[in-house]
Every structure is written in structure tokens, then in C-alpha cells.
Amino acid sequence: MVEGDSQHYAQMPYYLVPTVNSTDAITDFASKGYYVLMPTAQGIQKTDDVRDTVTIESLLTTSDSAYSKIDVNSGSIEKTDDDIEGPFDLGVSITETLDDDKETQIVYYSSSSLMDSQINQMVSGGNEQMIMESLSWMCSSDETSTISVPAKDL
């Protein structure tokens, strides 16, 4: 995934700074103006062929100028006619409502570097904040709605 808009990447066009969309999974995070950094992320393709009980929402999105390289071994990040044009989802939440009014919730982010401490520091803890809010959303119930993380020594 390569970002063509310099306002949506940091240092290199494959260090993506996506748009954060306000959804149930990350509402507070989105309203606080944090940034997210997703190096070497992959685009997520949503399908329309899902059960009626399933809802897929975009959490993180590239700009319209992003593109997916078809030939990743070409040695070039320049856009070619063969490349797939964006925008792309880089994070989604998936909810399925069951018959007994219970829900199954999944959050998927497409960068394996999202939780890397150096990457997180580059956005002043934004990645960690988003992950924690996502976990809190998935774990919330009538009994509890908070997640506790032990303090770290710096």
C-alpha cells in the first residue's frame, strides 16, 4: 500500500497516516484528534456478500490518492497503470447481532507494526490509545466496561 497524498503519510509513502472514522469502536479516540501510523499496511476489501446480521464499518481509511502495488518486487513505489487505486480501509470493525440480542464484535487492523513501541511513539501514543479503545469496545458488557493496563516504568 502506497499513499499518494503527502498529508497522509509520515517520512515514506508506505508509512500511512489514515483518516480516523468515528464509529462505535473508536468514537472517543476519533473525537480527540489523535493520529495513527500504519507502516506497510494492507488494504482491506469489504464484501457485500455477508449475512444480514453482520455489519462492517470502516475505522481507518486511506486518501483517494492511495494505491496498492501489484508488483511489489519491482523495486519502485511509483504508481503504474496496473496498480489498484484507493481509497482503502486499513481498519474495520465487524459486528454480528445474534438471535438472543447478543453481539459478536471483531476489530481488524491491517498492519503488523501497529503495536510497535517506536511506531506508537511517532504518533504520541495514538496507536496504543486506539487499540485500547477497540479492546474496551469489544469487551464491554453489562457487567464491566473498562480495561485496566498495568503502568509502565519509563
State where each predicted segment sits.
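Acidic/histidine-enriched alpha-helical segments
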Residues: 1, 144-154
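Acidic, S/T/G-rich, low-cysteine, solvent-exposed domains in lumenal/extracellular/periplasmic regions
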Residues: 1-143
